Structure formats: structure tokens, C-alpha cells
Amino acid sequence: MNYFPWLTIIVVFPIFAGSLIFFLPHKGNRVIRWYTICICILELLLTTYAFCYHFQSDDPLIQLVEDYKWINFFDFHWRLGIDGLSIGPILLTGFITTLATLAAWPVTRDSRLFHFLMLAMYSGQIGSFSSRDLLLFFIMWELELIPVYLLLCMWGGKKRLYSATKFILYTAGGSVFLLMGVLGLALYGSNEPTLNFETSVNQSYPVVLEIIFYIGFFIAFAVKSPIIPLHTWLPDTHGEAHYSTCMLLAGILLKMGAYGLIRINMELLPHAHSIFSPWLMIIGTIQIIYAALTSLGQRNLKKRIAYSSVSHMGFIIIGISSLTDTGLNGALLQIISHGFIGAALFFLAGTTYDRIRLVYLDEMGGIAIPMPKMFTMFSSFSMASLALPGMSGFVAELIVFFGIITGQKYLLIPKILITFVMAIGMILTPIYSLSMSRQMFYGYKLFNAPKDSFFDSGPRELFLSISIFLPVIGIGIYPDFVLSLAVDKVEVILSNFFYR
């Protein structure tokens, strides 16, 4: 056992260092920007070092465990630990947050508060992924919502207050169900309330009670993922938020919902999950088609990308509900893959808006010639989004496909129907993705406009795009880099469905 508190340092460091921003000397925004980026890089290096030297990927048990008594009255512990399931999202969080702080370079209004909120969000996200205590998980889940609300309220577009209110109503409503589920699990069947994940995993519940818990947790995670029909906050939020906030929302926030579904609904409540998995499969297939068709009808560029995110989350839901190790591994790979691709598309959409000051696709056109680098990067990530072979999205969706086909739970006819509908969804993806590129970059609309603001991507934007593109290509060529982290843990989770 490793006694050095690596995870506590990794969780607490961003918010602690971020609070020192307010004590920095007043010497312009440059000092604040560099300070925040240095904190993010230091945190990412610290996380990578701790995981490289103290984490054994072939061990499915919880590692780097820390357990400190916090509140005696309620048996509340500061309990942290990681396994193959959480290491990928934690590293993704570090990577995307570091790049999002770099993307936030143009933000000048209330710069101190903006960067502090980004670092507070960073702590909340890593805390959620590494919590091994149900109440601590809930606290971290909530800690991460407040910065998003403030980032939306203060640095959004014209309808930012409407979007922020809608976001907080949806997520706070989901959090009520999460809290009820946490307290229900803690107080069931024992005089002493137990909030420990390990104890809850080995606990068995009456079927009706397990179903009630499952529905409560599912609503909370369905809002965050988002799963239809609880997805309507997402397009509005993405449409109004600053693009650096959009990177964090698309890259990390949505993945927390999928992570919660696997960590709590699958691992803690396997009987209920096996009952609900056929319905989840149906919801996932409907979501892929519905969101792809809705995306095609969107005029707003950021809303179109937001609906594409909802469509891609459908593959994750199908992988989770397939109850096969292939399908679940595919879902975990899609979580990482879409984290990179979604963040990159929102970044490029935001930087394009900074130049041409147009939001609607039917007003754009012809910017490929004055902005060739932007055109190349946007086209590359559009290809990654539509799952081009050689990129991460293709491998993830293919593995989810195989997961359904090889699954023992479903009969042949439902399998054929689901794969057929998924295939239609995969055909619709290039239609909305390529039409988006065509409307933005081809034609003659903006070609004859004044070229004053039509400068191409600078070194910062180019560096940021390439930094995200390299992992997308890397995972597409060698997916085992991500898959090997969680293979053993996935087998342990799925063993509950056959032996319990």
C-alpha cells in the first residue's frame, strides 16, 4: 500500500492554487493566464507521474487508496481511490482542462474569477472520478456544477441567463434524485449508515428497492449524459457558453454522467441494470437517430455540434446496456474519444466565430480560401466525428457494434434491428457533419467580404488543435493504449451479472 496521499494532492491542488489567484499582484491578465496554465500543467504532470509509477494496470482492485475519518457523527470518510475505470477520465480531464485554459486566452473581463472557476471545476471533476465514498461523490458532483453556472452567467452570449437558469434547474433537479439514492443506499439494512463503495458493491437489495434506487440514480446521470428526453439544456448551454467552457462541458462534464452509470448503476445495482438494459438499448438507438436528424435541422453552428454530441452519447449508452465486455470497453473508449473530438469541434467553432462574428450556418460560406488552416483542422475533426477509419471514433463505434452482436442477453432479431438502426445513425452522421463543413467553408458568400478580420489560425490555436488531434489519431491506430487500462475492471463488473 502506498501511504503518500497522491490523490488528495491531485484533487485539492487546483482549487487551493486557484484561490491564490486573488492575491496575485495587479499586473494585467498575462500573469493570471500564465499562472493558471502553469498550475494545470503541473497538475497534469503530477497525475501522470502518480499513475505511471504507482498504478498497476493489470490489477482490477482499487489502488492508491486513501481513507481518512472526516465526520464521526455520520461515518463520513474522505475516501479516494482509482481503478481502470477512472484513470482514463481523470487523465482526459487534466488534458482537456489544460488546453481549455489555453483556449481562454482572449478572456479579459474578470479574468481572476474566470480562471479560478475553471480550476475549481477541475478539482470537482477529478474528485468525482476518484471518490470511493457515496456522499463524497455527491459533494464533488455538486462542487463542479457551481463554477459551470457562474461561467455561463458571466461569460456567455446574449441569452446566457436563460441558458444558465435552464442548466441549473435540470442539473439541480437531477442532483435531488442523486442525493436520495445516495442516502437510500447508505441507510438501507444496517444500524450504522455505510457510504463506502466497497461495502455497497457487496450488498444485496430486494428487487423492488433496487429498481427504485436504480431509477433515482439513472435520472441524475441521464440529465448529465444527457439521455433523451432530458437533453434540452445542452444545446442552449453550448449555444451561449464561451468556447473554453464548451470544451469542458463537451469533453468532461457529459462523460461524468456515463461514468456514473457504469460506476453506480452497473457496479452497485446489477440486478436492476440487467432488467433495464433492453430499455436502455432502445433509448440509445432512438437517441442516435433522433439527435442526428435534429442536428441536421440546426442553423446555429454550436447547437449542431451539441446535438452531434447527444447522438454520439447514444453509442455509449448502447455499449453500457450490451452487458458484454466488448460493448462496455467500446463505451469506455467512446467516452475518451468523444471527449477529445467534442472539445476540439467547439474550440474551432468558437475561434471561427471570433473572426467572422456569424453564428448561423446559412449566413456563412467561402472561408476556406482566406482561412486554410482553420479549414484543414475543422475538416479533420469532422472526419473524426463521423468515425473515419484510422481515428478514435471508428474503433470505439466498431467495438460497440461487436459488443451487441456477440452479446448473449439479446435474441437474434432484436440484435439485427438494433445494429440496423445504429447503421442508419452512422450514415446520418456524415450527412450533418459534411453539410456543416460545406456551409461554412465552400461557396462565395463571405469570399468577397472585407478581409480585415479574416486572419487564419495563430500559433496558439494551431498548437491546441494539433495537441487534441494527436491522441485522436493515436487511439485510432493503437486503441489498446486506452483499452488495456480498464479490461480487467470491466471483467470484474460484468462478473456480477453472471455470478450474483
Curated annotation (Swiss-Prot):
Membrane topology: Multi-pass membrane protein
GO biological process: ATP synthesis coupled electron transport; electron transport coupled proton transport
EC primary class: translocase
Transmembrane portions of the chain: 4-24, 35-55, 87-107, 113-130, 134-154, 167-187, 208-228, 242-262, 274-294, 305-325, 330-350, 386-406, 411-431, 462-482
Catalytic activity field: a plastoquinone + NADH + (n+1) H(+)(in) = a plastoquinol + NAD(+) + n H(+)(out); a plastoquinone + NADPH + (n+1) H(+)(in) = a plastoquinol + NADP(+) + n H(+)(out)
EC nos: 7.1.1.-
GO cellular component term of the entry, any: chloroplast thylakoid membrane
Compartment(s) of residence: Plastid, Chloroplast thylakoid membrane
NCBIfam families: NDH_I_M
HAMAP family noted in UniProt: NDH1_NuoM
PANTHER family recorded: NAD(P)H-QUINONE OXIDOREDUCTASE CHAIN 4, CHLOROPLASTIC, NADH-UBIQUINONE OXIDOREDUCTASE CHAIN 4
UniProt similarity note: Belongs to the complex I subunit 4 family.
The protein's name in its UniProt record: NAD(P)H-quinone oxidoreductase chain 4, chloroplastic
Gene source species: Nicotiana sylvestris
Gene (UniProt): ndhD
